[in-house]
Amino acid sequence: MIRHLGMKLSFVTLILISSIVFGADEIDISKAFIKLPRPGIDVTAGFATIKTNTDLKVMNVSNKNFKNIELHSMKMTYGVMEMRKLFEPKLGPNSPLVLSPGNNHLMLFGIKEKLKSGENLDLTFVFKDDEDNKIVKEFKFIVK
């Protein structure tokens, strides 16, 4: 009987630990879209809101249809709009990463195949947590 109770407790403990570990990298995305570039232009921008329940840094974003994808910020400095590359932007439980027109955004360089309105593209995001664990997630972005 004691052995049976011990097995039940071990099983419950395992379930609790699993839910903590698997819930730690919960990452949600909304409003994910890529702007359809004008004809002849091989660069465009992407936008989304990314939320998580833990502290993370964005290390990389990629897709085979683009030579390079970077995260950029935009801000007005002395009346001039400046765009700068963001290095390892952070997000957390109370601080989502908001990528929006005229603000932080994705810059997608070197379009290899023409984008079509309404098409879905999978962008691969690589995150790192506070313990340096790598988390790789694919998110769907619609071209519009």
Go through each PLM region and give its residues.
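Bacterial N-terminal signal peptides that target proteins for export
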Residues: I2-S10
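N-terminal signal peptide c-region/cleavage motif recognized by signal peptidases
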Residues: S18-I20
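Pyridoxal 5′-phosphate
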Residues: G23
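Compact, glycine-rich, soluble single-domain proteins
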Residues: E26-K144
